[in-house]
Amino acid sequence: MNAAFIPVRGGSKSIPLKNIKPICGKPLVYWTVKAASLCKFIDVVYVATDSDLIRQTVEDFALDKVKVIGRSAQSASDTASTESAMLEFAESFDFDNIVLIQATSPLLTAEDLDRGFEIFAREDTDSVLSAVKQYRFNWSVDEKGIATPTNYDVFNRPRRQDFDGYLVENGAFYITSKADLLKSQNRVSGNIKPC
C-alpha cells in the first residue's frame, strides 16, 4: 500500500497558520492534498497536524482517500525534523511505501506524483525526490569576499544551449519504502532518482 504523508504544523513562526492561508482562493494545503488524492498510485492520504483549525480545514475539503491524523507536540515543535514526524507516523500506521509531500508546494500535480511512482517502481530505485533542472552559473564567496565560479570555467563560459545544467531538489515530494525509512531514519536513501 502506498501512503501519502503531509505534515502540516500549526505553529509556523514566520507566517502563522501559513498552510491554510488562501492561495488562488483555496487554503495553501488544499493544493497538495488534492494532488495526492488524485494520484493513481496513492491509496490513502494522511495529513498530520497538531492544529484543530487545520484539521477542520482539511476535513472540510471532503476529498477522497484523505484522513487527518494527530501529530505529537514533539514532532511538531520548531526544532523537530520532518523525519521525526515521518518516523512517528511509521510507528503507528501500516503501509509499504510512503511519499512525503510538503504542504508548501501548491504547484504539485497528481501527474507529478504519478511520474514519481513510475520511477520508484523501477528495479534499481530505492527512493525518488522531486527536482528541477537549473541552467545557472553559480559562484561561491570565500572569507576574503573573493567570488569563484563553482560549476563552470570562467575562461570557457559555455553557451546556455551547450550547458548541461544541474539538478536542484525542489522539496515538493520524496518517495521511499517504509523499510528503508525505518532503516535509514531518512526520507531518502539507497539508489535515489530524480523526478
Segments the model singles out, each with a brief description of its role:
Residues 101-103:
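Active-site acidic Asp-centered loop
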Residues 78-85, 106-193:
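Conserved core of the sugar-phosphate nucleotidyltransferase
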Residues 42, 95, 124-126:
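Short, high-confidence coil segments that cap the C-terminus of an alpha-helix
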Residues 1-16:
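N-terminal nucleotide-binding beta1-loop-alpha1 segment
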Residues 52-99, 108-115:
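Short phosphate-binding loop-to-helix
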Residues 26, 49-52:
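Residues in the short beta-alpha loop(s) of Rossmann-like NAD(P)-binding domains
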Residues 28-45, 56:
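A short, N-terminal amphipathic alpha-helix
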Residues 3-5, 44-46, 99, 128, ...:
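A structural signal for isolated positions on well-ordered beta-strands in alpha/beta enzyme cores
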